[in-house]
């Protein structure tokens, strides 16, 4: 038996808690509904970092900007030991302990699928397009989710590699990245203290699609320039609102 409980959220969102007899933990999240009454909105699923929860920036900012499209819904859920299902001491320390479980990725992908399918069923939505945004821990879970049977159209990922803080799951990430065939924007920090450059590039190179791009900036893990977030939003908007998006190449650009 499955149930969903609703409550007022933050930043204009509605919080929800999904419980079921076959779940070992509740699924907690937030939904920003489209301002239009369309039953075929685009959806963007948003994953947060290990130190945050479903409302970690830039998720509320992204929801506000993409919400201007009127027929776009934003769905964010808490990580496995985060937010409304926090496990002490919380944050990265709790997450790194969670990573010791051999099934932690599959359980989180399951949570994402249940949350998405429950929400679209509750509101009788038939999404037209499906996108994903998730950096750092949001990429650790995002890449396996993007490789699942959900039909994603585009995604923004990054702040993650196949080594460093993700070394325990590096091979899994590389294998799943090789299944991703839709457009990808990848964010990289050149002095990232959690992920080395080699692991970053190995993960980016493993992504199957040819329609991918990487933006690299100097700075530590959390020092992503604001303009990269704006680029991420525009990237998602482009692929969510246009039926056919092709990359134009100027060739040759110089002689």
Model-based region annotation:
Residues 1-39:
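N-terminal cap/lid segment of alpha/beta-hydrolase-fold proteins
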Residues 39-49:
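Short beta-strand element of the alpha/beta-hydrolase
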Residues 56-77:
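Short amphipathic alpha-helix adjacent to the substrate-entry channel of hydrolases
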Residues 59-60, 145, 169-173, 182, ...:
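Short alpha-helix in the alpha/beta-hydrolase fold that links the catalytic acid
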Residues 90, 94-123:
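Alpha/beta-hydrolase active-site loop
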Residues 110-179:
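Primarily recognizes the serine-hydrolase "nucleophile elbow" in alpha/beta-hydrolase
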Residues 180, 186-188:
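Short beta-strand/loop motif that positions the catalytic acidic residue
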Residues 202, 209-255:
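C-terminal catalytic histidine-bearing segment of alpha/beta-hydrolase fold enzymes
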